[in-house]
Amino acid sequence: MLFRSGLQRVRSSARQNILVFPWGDQVVQFLLAGVRTRTSHFFSNVACILLLLLTPAWASKPKEKPSQPALPDMLLEGGRKLSYERSFSSQREVKPKRGFWNKVLDFVAGEPEFRSLVRPYSIAVDSRGRIIVTDPGAIGVHIFDFQQQKYKFLSRAGKGKDPMLAPQCVAVDAQDNIYVTDSESGKVFVFNSDGKYQRALGSLKGGEGFFKRPTGIAVDSVAQRIYVTDTLRNKIFVLDMQGSVVQTIGENGEGPGKFNFPTELRLDGQNLIVVDAMNFSVQVLDRSGAFKYAVGKIGDSPGTMFRPKGIGLDSEGDLYVVDGLWGVVQVFNRDGDLLYYFGNRGTSAGEFQLPAGLFIDHNDRIFVVDSFNRRVQVFHYYGVAKPSKGGSQ
């Protein structure tokens, strides 16, 4: 055997050399005619090298990843349903398929390195459909643009001024600017829609209006306000777009409007929805901070929570809450009643290991950060069909 790749010289005589290599499920032989001279040996060796280069990149049948069986749709009341779409975990899945010569180059020089999710946490989707994922494990932010087949990684790790240490939650505004909380540096990093760093808000130097551990974030582009939960201060800071504090909401405690380690938050019309992690619930407040109602309590049965994480709202106003410990997503109506839940602890499609962030786009696609499985899983909620206007066509 000449090479482990499968290219072999099987016979040699004074009159001919025969090369054989695998082509899919068949074997192809090449006859190299000529007498046993230095010239024939030269061309024979050249042919061997060429075939070695071409066999992995072109001739051999590409190995296909075993596909997961399609998950059945979850059928809900009133003709609604929830479908599993896909998962993704690396830059490789965004880039277009590489052509023949690129594969040859990859074989000679080695395949390019692709970034993968390490310990993803939070997620947002901008108006262009780009999926933005914070990754404390990689100390940066991944931007997956499947429509344009582009990928970008944002990081300020190791920067002398305003270094990024532990990116947590992410939000986007109406102009697709990106806002990232950093729980260790105590700042909010702002990038423009192209991913260029703009500024940092907040400080750890102390004093009212400075963050200790910023986590959840939401942006109101109309009112020009930024909402940030500070988990250690047990309150929500409301900032203007320059980073000045204009209002604080909440205090430490267990009653309505009080928090015990608040984390994620979302804006919904005039409502402010906050994950109250160590009170094992989600509180719904108005923009002034007045309490409206709460969902959940500690427990291990449907409708209860143990480690509430990401939250989101679909087009019908139903509230989705990730439970990181139980590995499920629970769905509540506006009255706080549990409608259904999906997921389970595991590694298969539709299962989660320590899920964290959640985002629902305007098409009711549900993105769940499956943190310990190092991936994002995508589901699609199909609600009640709205009657068409204007009569029949």
Predicted segments with their positions:
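Short, small-residue-biased leader/transition segments that mark boundaries at the very start
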Residues: 1-2
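Generic detector of N-terminal low-structure segments
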Residues: 5, 20-23, 32, 44-45
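Bacterial N-terminal signal peptides
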Residues: 44-54
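Eukaryotic scaffold repeat domains enriched in small/polar residues
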Residues: 58-393
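Bacterial N-terminal signal peptides that target proteins for export
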Residues: 28-46
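Compositionally biased, intrinsically disordered low-complexity segments enriched in Pro/Arg/Gln/His
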Residues: 7-9
